[in-house]
């Protein structure tokens, strides 16, 4: 039996649904109340995997009008996942993880103007925040320009998400075997 849910026209899924989906390999790492129970390495690994899932989800979106709410909700979940990754990488003592997180922040900063146009603010610390009114009213084509498979921002983010996950996996293996 398949675990895949097929979403028809008119079905709206919450950002919490997408967040749980991104953290499917470790769901508790995606909840703010449970994150403190994990080591930094465990969080970095879970966040790296989740960020890769978020990028995959967004780059496979069709950005059609009938999926408008789902697209916006998956972007909201991406924001939370991105912020979680920066937090766990920032608290790590691993230079590779820190460097990849810094590069991810730099890439996002390069796109701050485009993100701002759809209601996403790049904060001074590199984290992202959505501004509800503009986020909910921004044209879906602007989301597509940033988050589709052809978008340079997503392509570059994907590269660093892969690097973050690999660094976190390596760090996790070192701490469990050493």
Predicted regions and their residues:
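Polar, low-complexity export/assembly segments characteristic of proteins
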Residues: 1-178
